[in-house]
Amino acid sequence: MGERTPMLKMVGVSKSFPGVKALDNVSLMAYGGEVTALMGENGAGKSTLMKILSGVYKKDEGKIFIEGREVEVKGIKSAEEAGITIIHQELSVLNNLTVSENIFLGNEKHSKFTGRINKKLLDERSKMFLEQIGCDIDPNRLVSTLNVGEKQMIEIAKALTKNARIIIMDEPTTALTDVETENLFKVIENLRKKGIAIIYISHRMEEIFKICHRVEVLRDGKYTGSAEIKDIDNDKLIAMMVGRTIEDQFPYRDVKKGDLALEVKNLSCKEGVKGASFTLRKGEILGIAGLMGSGRTELAKTIFGEYKKTSGEISLNGSLININCISDAINNGICYLSEDRKKEGCILGMSVGENMTLCNLKKYENKFKSLDKKEEAKDIEYYIKKINIKTPNKEQFIKNLSGGNQQKVILAKWLMLSPEVLIIDEPTRGIDVGAKKEIYELLNELKASGKAIIMISSDLPEVLGISDRIMVMSEGRISGELNRDEANQESIMKLAVGINN
């Protein structure tokens, strides 16, 4: 028997963005009638590869073959013409339209005589495609009346109208109930039986082993291998995903821990945190790891007062505190550096100095209620020198600085308030290697001075490299905690995907 021809074959695909090589000579195969899992840590390159396949990005190098024939994917339309469709985690249905209007959006059927949309034909065809995936939804229903699982069925039916041969599903069960998830699996089985190749992206191990036939793994923008699901287990798959040792690039500093600074008990919020409890000491960096959507940022924003807690208590230095808004957190000495520094951390149209003193203007008010510019300038210059911010002057627009220097300005903004607890979310995202090390040194200095630090990061070597303890979150809950000496990438990944033993 000859070798099977894959439905999809990607060979030597590379893609660079300014300063970053997102994909480096990546290959991928998927077969018709099979579900292929695409696995990798956050930042491994999964999304970039799928955006190239679906026409969102253009590849720099490489080839794409469908059923042995090379195709050139120049955009979303050409991808769809080649039979490639992606169903994003954030569904793109329009709530104010009916089911059939959504299914045929952009591909409406018009009457030959009037030129108007043939609603009857639209409904009939929609019903046919829905029946093909075993779905009984009235084509006339408004999409706003459907649940998330039903909306997902609309997206799948829409893919079938475009004669999709390859369907990419990106974290499809994230917002689904158990019942909706089982329904989706039945639909995937129907699609598989029709000979469609499914590429399934998920961090939920139990799903991968339940519905997938093969797995393809990326790590740090490179292809690390593939395997038949029947030939591997959890441990082997996790080893393929992480597989690297920590280099000596993290200047960890061991300092004596002080008194209890922060205690969180049974904290929950409607944005996705469920009963979180943990402690943090002075002179300690607590790393928080977890996959995208695990609730790490939501936990930080609840402690910071951006999200309102629905239950739980927060204590600072042994005393219960009430945090109902951001100003409550700041007044109690809790500060938060957002993962998105350009949208939430700084004001790009303002100067370095203006950004730095933005949260502390009252300090510079004189008796006439105007700003003491001399005193303000003195503090700005102090922090520019102290944390080595590379800027021509304090008047420079922050948007003109590098990512690392922008991050230092935001850090200086909070340090001016002398916080007790500093929460820093993705501290080195989009920052070059040299600047990363400077940020780590700064965090170590703050730790040595007695600050209590929470560091959220998707970069496992970073978490392992500079944290004193590591807390892992999965689906809104704290799934485990590891001491620095016992933690490694595999033990963190197991907790991140919900494997506790």
Swiss-Prot record:
Disulphide bridges, residue numbers: none
Q: Where in the cell is it found?
A: Cell membrane
EC annotation?
Answer: 7.5.2.7
Q: Which SUPFAM superfamilies does this entry report, sorted A to Z?
A: P-loop containing nucleoside triphosphate hydrolases
Which parts of the sequence belong to the ABC transporter domain? Answer: 8-245, 255-500
**GO MF annotations, alphabetized:** ABC-type D-ribose transporter activity; ATP binding; ATP hydrolysis activity
| Cellular component per GO, a single term | plasma membrane
Which family does the record assign? Belongs to the ABC transporter superfamily. Ribose importer (TC 3.A.1.2.1) family.
**Protein's UniProt name:** Ribose import ATP-binding protein RbsA
